[in-house]
Swiss-Prot record:
Keywords: Gluconate utilization, NADP, Oxidoreductase. This is Probable 2-ketogluconate reductase. The lineage of its organism: Bacteria, Bacillati, Bacillota, Bacilli, Bacillales. It comes from Bacillus subtilis (strain 168). Coiled coil: none annotated. It comes from the Bacteria. NAD(+) binds at residues 158-159, 211, 238-240, 264, 288-291.
Amino acid sequence: MLKPFVFITKPIPEEIEAFIGEHCRYEVWQEDTLPSDVLFEKLKEAEGLLTSGTSGPSINRELLEHAPKLKVVSNQSVGYDNFDIEAMKERGVVGTHTPYTLDDTVADLAFSLILSSARRVAELDRFVRAGKWGTVEEEALFGIDVHHQTLGIIGMGRIGEQAARRAKFGFDMEVLYHNRHRKQETEDSIGVKYAELDTLLEQSDFILLITPLTDETYHMIGEREFKLMKNSAIFVNISRGKTVDEKALIRALQEGWIRGAGLDVYEKEPVTQDNPLLQLDNVTLLPHIGSATAKVRFNMCKQAAENMLAAIQGQTPKNLTREFQ
């Protein structure tokens, strides 16, 4: 009997290719750009699609119309804002993602942005490379402390909890959090305190945004919210770029509403060279690499492959997104 066919939108480790090949016929797209017409042609026979929630195609009605046999879209990412949930349900296509494997790694990155922004690591690296060491008074290079300060976390999911542990037990910080639902068990085990969003913004020295992108969270941090923050605050976003009004963030940095920012995500990715953020010294910029370690990316890819194969074989994948559970 002919094995089912699956399409993979970007290169994956050879070991995982071999694993998929034991159960399916497959094709891996090797180029940087995947034209829509090519994708649609590949999907004519595909029962599974392995892709990414950050760099993969939008799973919308147009795509699904070209994929009559599709059973599952497996994201190699935690986020799945590329899913049109309603359209997928209408077609009987389930969606999966890869939570759990990256929680600690992304929390580590969050703290690297907090520390880098507080101590101006990227800015002062450029300062030294430009031969400016010794040209200004030392006070001009001062940063701010992280330990014993207040961290406000917006979105107390698994990554938020790991970030809170680092803050509380590693840096002896006061930790406030805001979440859709209060989490008493987390409050008891870690010692964090729930706060309304405005209170968190007003009282925190560092603000960490780790919320999924939904209709409700689109531009949830804008001019009003930045003006509520301390002018000494540092804002860090590792969620999705569109949770923040980027124009308001740029003004906040330019006009001193806040001290600085650390960003791993942006409204438009990759960032274009005319983005004003690139001209600002008080922001640390990363290229959306929250989970980017070799071990974690391998584990995410393996989990995505297992999710896809389970759905194709008529089993319930371990990591269905909540809308398909």
